Amino acid sequence: MTTIFYAEPELVIAYGRKVLFLNPNDLQIFKDIELPADLTSCGLKITAPEISEEQQSTSEGKGTDGGKVEVAILNVCYSPDRQLIALTTAGQKALLLYKSRPEHAKLLSVRALARASSAMTFAADSSSVLVTDKTGDCYQYDCVEVNALPRLLLGHLSIVYDILWTPDQKHIITSDRDDKIRVTNYPATFDIHSYCLGHKEFVSGLALLTEEHLLSVSGDKTLRLWNYLSGMELLHHDLPAPAVRLHMRELLPAKRYQAAVQFYDHIEAIGLYELEQTNNIWTVACEQLVRAEAGSWNISNFALTSDMIYVAGAVNEHLALRVYNASDGEQAKTVPAGWLDMVTGSFSDQTCVPEDLSVWFKKRYDNVSDYMERKKRRIEGQQQK
């Protein structure tokens, strides 16, 4: 899985066992993190009783068949105060916490995860981090007492694709494969505050606009805006294709925002939507589609800045990075090709296999049609006798 996001002034790219922190303005590499092939060499231990024997075998660097387990980064997240970096891994499933300052990242802790992570976010005060896994559970990990055991906060019945923690830390917002958006009270996470219901497919991305407004995108080809405290839908906008990624920029506080959406299997790879609030009514003021040479390469993820769109993908099973103007969607000519080659060259020793997003869609089975067809053949057979 390729991770890329922009946290001003840094562009963060992660794939395989490596994370790069870049400054796209002066074309410099701030720092990098490279994980060892075996995380036990940097302190991975099994401490949680609920972790299975399979996880223990992988934590020792071997799979259940005795082969070597490939460590791969799944999620990367900066803390709000920019002092901490959290990342999760597959293979040897772990949560690693780094101190990001000074220049070189310093490893603070390595904690085993019971299952592969699906999403992650920090508390507003950077005191803890929430990690959701592929079975729908959400755990809280302390960033101060790094040896403290994780706390199970909530659970879904399907994989959680995105998670937000409101700035006042009173609500945790999660979205899942079963088209639900849940708003859970915190710290009393046994109490569900509200649901935002209306999507018909997986909800792939969430973004907070104001202290009560939430943006969501889904595989049902819609972008929706909610008052998440009441669960009321305030805006419904049709998209040209299923949405699999969402990034958001604030243009004018509480008034105007830009949402960038990555589409699944569409000739236009990315859509830019400007959302505007006037007299408490939200509208899509303008929209723009960016092709990003879709179809000529496998696009995995993207990052949005004030003037550029950085798109990561795969070409011939190697990581590729291309840059487009946010204003017109054309390929940026101000970014030197040599710099892009330098960045992707840092990952040249790793095979880049695109994530299969088709598994995000729910499979529907029509048993009635099969039954009716068998019944029809049986009746026809009886009539021929």
Curated annotation (Swiss-Prot):
<comment type="pathway">
    <text>tRNA modification; N(7)-methylguanine-tRNA biosynthesis.</text>
</comment>
<dbReference type="GO" id="GO:0001673">
    <property type="term" value="C:male germ cell nucleus"/>
</dbReference>
<keyword id="KW-0217">Developmental protein</keyword>
<keyword id="KW-0819">tRNA processing</keyword>
<dbReference type="GO" id="GO:0007283">
    <property type="term" value="P:spermatogenesis"/>
</dbReference>
<dbReference type="GO" id="GO:0001674">
    <property type="term" value="C:female germ cell nucleus"/>
</dbReference>
<dbReference type="GO" id="GO:0043527">
    <property type="term" value="C:tRNA methyltransferase complex"/>
</dbReference>
<protein>
    <recommendedName>
        <fullName>tRNA (guanine-N(7)-)-methyltransferase non-catalytic subunit wuho</fullName>
    </recommendedName>
</protein>
<keyword id="KW-0963">Cytoplasm</keyword>
<keyword id="KW-0221">Differentiation</keyword>
<dbReference type="GO" id="GO:0005829">
    <property type="term" value="C:cytosol"/>
</dbReference>
<dbReference type="GO" id="GO:0048477">
    <property type="term" value="P:oogenesis"/>
</dbReference>
<keyword id="KW-0896">Oogenesis</keyword>
<dbReference type="Pfam" id="PF00400">
    <property type="entry name" value="WD40"/>
</dbReference>
<keyword id="KW-0853">WD repeat</keyword>
<comment type="similarity">
    <text>Belongs to the WD repeat TRM82 family.</text>
</comment>
<feature type="repeat" description="WD 1">
    <location>
        <begin position="68"/>
        <end position="108"/>
    </location>
</feature>
<dbReference type="InterPro" id="IPR015943">
    <property type="entry name" value="WD40/YVTN_repeat-like_dom_sf"/>
</dbReference>
<keyword id="KW-0744">Spermatogenesis</keyword>
<comment type="function">
    <text>Required for the Mettl1-dependent formation of N(7)-methylguanine at position 46 (m7G46) in tRNA. In the Mettl1-wuho methyltransferase complex, it is required to stabilize and induce conformational changes of the catalytic subunit. Required for binding of nanos mRNA and repression of translation by the mei-P26-bgcn-bam-sxl complex. May cooperate with mei-P26 and nanos to derepress the BMP signaling pathway. May cooperate with mei-P26 to suppress expression of a subset of microRNAs. May cooperate with mei-P26 to regulate bam expression levels in germline cells during gametogenesis.</text>
</comment>
<dbReference type="GO" id="GO:0005634">
    <property type="term" value="C:nucleus"/>
</dbReference>
<dbReference type="InterPro" id="IPR001680">
    <property type="entry name" value="WD40_rpt"/>
</dbReference>
<dbReference type="InterPro" id="IPR028884">
    <property type="entry name" value="Trm82"/>
</dbReference>
<feature type="repeat" description="WD 3">
    <location>
        <begin position="198"/>
        <end position="236"/>
    </location>
</feature>
<comment type="subunit">
    <text>Forms a heterodimer with the catalytic subunit Mettl1. Interacts with mei-P26 and weakly interacts with bgcn; required for the function or formation of the mei-P26-bgcn-bam-sxl complex. Interacts with nanos; may be involved in mei-P26-dependent derepression of the BMP signaling pathway. Interacts with Myc; the interaction may be mediated by mei-P26 and may be involved in the regulation of ribosome biogenesis.</text>
</comment>
<keyword id="KW-0539">Nucleus</keyword>
<keyword id="KW-0677">Repeat</keyword>
<feature type="repeat" description="WD 2">
    <location>
        <begin position="155"/>
        <end position="194"/>
    </location>
</feature>
<dbReference type="GO" id="GO:0106004">
    <property type="term" value="P:tRNA (guanine-N7)-methylation"/>
</dbReference>
